[in-house]
Amino acid sequence: MSESKRIKTALVSVYHKEGLDEIITKLYEEGVEFLSTGGTRQFIESLGYPCKAVEDLTTYPSILGGRVKTLHPKIFGGILCRRDLEQDIQQIEKYEIPEIDLVIVDLYPFEATVASGASEADIIEKIDIGGISLIRAAAKNYNDVIIVASQAQYKPLLDMLMEHGATSSLEERRWMAKEAFAVSSHYDSAIFNYFDAGEGSAFRCSVNNQKQLRYGENPHQKGYFYGNLDAMFDQIHGKEISYNNLLDINAAVDLIDEYEDLTFAILKHNNACGLASRPTVLEAWTDALAGDPVSAFGGVLITNGVIDKAAAEEINKIFFEVIIAPDYDVDALEILGQKKNRIILVRKEAKLPKKQFRALLNGVLVQDKDMNIETVADLRTVTDKAPTPEEVEDLLFANKIVKNSKSNAIVLAKGKQLLASGVGQTSRVDALKQAIEKAKSFGFDLNGAVMASDAFFPFPDCVEIADKEGITAVIQPGGSVKDDLTFAYCNEHGMAMVTTGIRHFKH
């Protein structure tokens, strides 16, 4: 197996021609002959260098509006021929197929076309067929052929040519083949993701959409994000988004999307520590902050309303990591941008995946995202006393928060304001006690408040504790074998309870 290979013939067919001129010039100086198609051939000839048309080699014209140009045995035979196999050499000589030693390809910009909002017909036309086939063929035969599969690889090729002329080592060819397969796998993943639109049970990513983060969950851990944050947000101020920021941003987006009313939420470690629905952003912020002004320090803020100057002046009084809104007025941005590192995001309209993935052990868990949002129609009153219209509003309000809180979770709310929550507890009773203690520590009166639970009550103990604190209405999934005991206690003490039939565990 020969280490060094000389480049005698290069097939060049690219979309992006910026940076190609230096390569073509150097190759010509090294005596390399060119083979190309359409626009690329015209580009090479415009530089003053001869270039043979693919059609002249194949004796077959480009057909179907350019859909079929290079897909021909005289092209692929020249790429895939194994130079150390006598049988291959005999066949290409018999059919007068020239050996192709270098393939330079740059694929149609499929992702950019999708991002531009183009029609499906235009998007389909940007699915490269010949180019991806050339990449795979040349990469497969890296023992004899060097492949440049994207504009990003123009410089490595030029550096190689400048270092030792039109020759390549096996190590260089193998490295370029690896990069080529990274390009082809990413390209196919992008096409799959377009057609799948988040429906599939497989998560596909590649190094092409990898973003290295400052670190992972802790400084001693490396961290990466695979995806396209630019499709979801415009970052208009602040430092680089961290691994932990992304976790909280994800939780914040999931939570705020539950609400149609103007709402402001404050999150810390993926859980809401403040949330309120109000007529204005300023009012919503003020009451959300009142829920837990201590935990709000260093949190992630999100609203579904436009942040104005009045709201920004109040928000600016505390330290926080990230703020997300659909828009900000000019004065608000000037105020919020006073802190250099503060991350300010404008949220865009973007389709989110319907599947969730979690790596564990030696595999990956996949599940449907919990997209169920209970409404009045889903509530079943299981007590003699029905909740009042105001209590129903609060129950649904609280249920959305508990759905997005770590289990076991209890949420206490009143007047469309989060009073307190107990989250991530091994006991539902402990979660309730935590919520009660927290609400009292910030001066909230629990009389007339409602309680939401992410799962059923195995015993009546939680409603007994809630009753003693003045809580008057409860929402829970139901389904315990001892539901009747819980319902009976509520009836005896004049409490209203509704069940939804939907559990919202979150681990």
Swiss-Prot record:
It comes from Bacteroides thetaiotaomicron (strain ATCC 29148 / DSM 2079 / JCM 5827 / CCUG 10774 / NCTC 10582 / VPI-5482 / E50). Keywords: Hydrolase, Multifunctional enzyme, Purine biosynthesis, Transferase. Its EC number is 2.1.2.3, 3.5.4.10. This is Bifunctional purine biosynthesis protein PurH. SMART domains: AICARFT_IMPCHas (SM00798), MGS (SM00851). It comes from the Bacteria. PROSITE patterns: MGS. Pathway: Purine metabolism; IMP biosynthesis via de novo pathway; 5-formamido-1-(5-phospho-D-ribosyl)imidazole-4-carboxamide from 5-amino-1-(5-phospho-D-ribosyl)imidazole-4-carboxamide (10-formyl THF route): step 1/1; Purine metabolism; IMP biosynthesis via de novo pathway; IMP from 5-formamido-1-(5-phospho-D-ribosyl)imidazole-4-carboxamide: step 1/1. Disulfide bonds: none annotated. The lineage of its organism: Bacteria, Pseudomonadati, Bacteroidota, Bacteroidia, Bacteroidales. GO terms for biological process: 'de novo' IMP biosynthetic process. InterPro entries: AICAR_Tfase_dup_dom_sf (IPR024051), Cytidine_deaminase-like (IPR016193), MGS-like_dom (IPR011607), MGS-like_dom_sf (IPR036914), PurH-like (IPR002695). Belongs to the PurH family.
